[in-house]
Amino acid sequence: MEFRVHLQADNEQKIFQNQMKPEPEASYLINQRRSANYKPNIWKNDFLDQSLISKYDGDEYRKLSEKLIEEVKIYISAETMDLVAKLELIDSVRKLGLANLFEKEIKEALDSIAAIESDNLGTRDDLYGTALHFKILRQHGYKVSQDIFGRFMDEKGTLENHHFAHLKGMLELFEASNLGFEGEDILDEAKASLTLALRDSGHICYPDSNLSRDVVHSLELPSHRRVQWFDVKWQINAYEKDICRVNATLLELAKLNFNVVQAQLQKNLREASRWWANLGIADNLKFARDRLVECFACAVGVAFEPEHSSFRICLTKVINLVLIIDDVYDIYGSEEELKHFTNAVDRWDSRETEQLPECMKMCFQVLYNTTCEIAREIEEENGWNQVLPQLTKVWADFCKALLVEAEWYNKSHIPTLEEYLRNGCISSSVSVLLVHSFFSITHEGTKEMADFLHKNEDLLYNISLIVRLNNDLGTSAAEQERGDSPSSIVCYMREVNASEETARKNIKGMIDNAWKKVNGKCFTTNQVPFLSSFMNNATNMARVAHSLYKDGDGFGDQEKGPRTHILSLLFQPLVN
């Protein structure tokens, strides 16, 4: 179907303005409407207007950054540096949020390292060096076997006891073990034993307080599951304190780059904020979450690089719509209304909304207009054809999954865990986000590109599973209190007659298994140029879920933790 067929006339494209008021509803229906009691938005427009201004958005700082980049390139390309020092430098560059600036130099260095036989690396009997070597190569898509750790294991396949005395090597192997694939038993065993050993190490007095700090940070969440940009400030502060290996030029560049990128993000947030304010939807859907800034922070977590500005704004819009529609289904709509709304999205036809309350009509109209606009921009910028049907399909699937959950709620039905996850992975909205991501950052070219999403449904499923299960771990308590439809935790507890503690442990195990499958897919394809950005975005969506729901509901309660984190990420520059 031609894209233009889907576009309404200009007068039909106009978004409802702020002054639009919902038509009165019957009092009996108003009384049936639920409320999640979400708190008002804390990020006021006046605050955003005053705060989103940075002195680092200027040529002076960009020129200084370019000068420092050239100096660091020399360090990375130095042929006289020993292997472990080179690997540590590459590791630091990544942790400091600078890897995108040195892709060519890092690849050349790792190509040389990967060509060396493992027995000739000089790290044969060095657990730390071996683990660092394994981690860096696997992160960058090189083939490296878990068998290189065999020499550190006893006849039972567990880490030899004397290695537990070396905290630095233990920590690096723990981090490396989180990059494991399915069936890599050595890494599984190492992760299990090291998790316990590193926790116990907190009771021992180590002279290196920096190392003890790193242990606590990794046990809280391994670096592979952290959103890189969310962690950059912490890593810069940690690197600055590591006087044994700090590189002054690299540190200066890391601080400057953070501030320059933050200035770009602030410009993006201003643009997204204007879009959101002009819609006026927050004023008319009082029951729904007004979380523009949090949505933007999630988009930053998926792709922070300056060249992805338009994609970040696109993704912010999509995440906002996901939240609003989720609240329509969870809180506001009756079952009959939700069926009409689902039909409207499925048929992409506003006539299906004629019997709906004005606020639900408005919600559909915003979805319609925004999706058509995004499809047009993708077609113009990336050369794709027929994007709109792809986008409307994932929105329809999302709404159908939400409708199933609404029906479960109305019938007080608790599904089996398998039934719940089959639907819940769709209602997680990951497919919506990933399909928008795919078309936004890739370009039409080969048949392989066009078939990629279909051939990699397992990747989409496992990313969705990680997001869904993290969501349930963080929001289950609040949802049970509100009486929402059941989560995976409730389904598991009922299915096997387990305690909540046991259910949560099982859910975390499912997340671990899903990560192994994601690793197996991503680390074997991320050297393919046209896929590496998309693969990185896909795994970042899973990482955002870990961050968002680590301490509860990152969307529901802005004050509980997200506020401080967002202030640091988007508003507070680093002091040089």
UniProtKB/Swiss-Prot annotation:
SUPFAM superfamilies, per database record: Terpenoid cyclases/Protein prenyltransferases (SSF48239), Terpenoid synthases (SSF48576)
Effect of mutating A297S: In strain: cv. cv. Idared, cv. Pinkie, cv. Ralls and cv. Royal Gala
Compartment(s) where it occurs, according to its Swiss-Prot or TrEMBL record: Cytoplasm
CDD domains: Terpene_cyclase_plant_C1 (cd00684)
Residues annotated to bind K(+): D484, S487
Residues annotated for Mg(2+) 1 binding in this entry: D326, D330
Effect of T130A: In strain: cv. Idared
GO MF entry, a single one: transferase activity
Domain remark from Swiss-Prot or TrEMBL: The Asp-Asp-Xaa-Xaa-Asp/Glu (DDXXD/E) motif is important for the catalytic activity, presumably through binding to Mg(2+).
Family, per entry: Belongs to the terpene synthase family. Tpsb subfamily.
Name this protein carries in UniProt: (E,E)-alpha-farnesene synthase
Lineage: Eukaryota, Viridiplantae, Streptophyta, Embryophyta, Tracheophyta
Gene, per the UniProt record: AFS1
